Amino acid sequence: MTQSEAQAPQAPRDAVGSEAVIVAKDVHKWYDNGFNVLKGVSLNVYKGEVVVVMGPSGSGKSTFIRTFNALEPYQEGSIEIDGTLIGYDIKDIEAVRREVGMVFQQFNLFPHLTVLKNVTLAPQWVRRWPKAKAEEIAMRLLDRVGIAEQANKFPGQLSGGQQQRVAIARSLAMQPKVMLFDEPTSALDPEMVREVLDVMRNLAKDGMTMVCVTHEVGFAREVADRVVLMDGGVLVEENTPEAFFNNPKEERTQAFLSQIL
């Protein structure tokens, strides 16, 4: 398989929509030192689809998904989120960021604010919601992720898994069309991983469009519509979970899986 064939966006399965919410075409990115971290990556993500991105350290996977909300700029190619081009127009970038939620390895919660205030801050300032509406939605979301009883505590009083669930609720409070997850369980103790993955599973069942950088193979097998392998700044292979894990086409994919399975 050639690189261009490997990177040709695949059509979604019948279970997801036909509307592409994310359209990335031939995306290139260089760092200031000249390092080419993304080398012409193309990927479509469809409404309601869950795409898991895997790859070794330094493969460009986290950088790639961070271009989807302009946390990382790119120099060539194009990225559209729900029809809005991410370019240099600050209004377009702000519009995209309102529609794209992101959860990181670290929780990035404000330590001096309660859980409830962490979740309501952005909707009040960015969406201009009144306090009562923001708090009502926040409590509903905290209940959804299983920590409504922690609403008046501070982040430092919570476990890592609880803090990550607050971070997910905070992103959902903006009512995004897309959720990005950048290795959301990698900083957690093993016994806390499941509670975060359960929240992500429920989001997928509810039809949230999701792009997840993770090496949680069980989650990918169960929840993903497609699994993508990146290495060296290129998309090596993308396929259904069954084909990706049981019958990978590329030698690089086979070698990678031999190290994590």
Map each language-model feature to its residues:
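Pre-NBD coupling/linker segments of ABC/ABC-like ATPases
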Residues: 1-16, 253
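C-terminal boundary and immediately downstream tail of ABC-type ATPase nucleotide-binding domains
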Residues: 2-3, 229-231, 238, 242-261
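Intrinsically disordered, low-complexity regions enriched in polar/acidic and amide residues
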Residues: 2, 6-9, 104, 149, ...
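ABC family nucleotide-binding domain
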Residues: 17-241
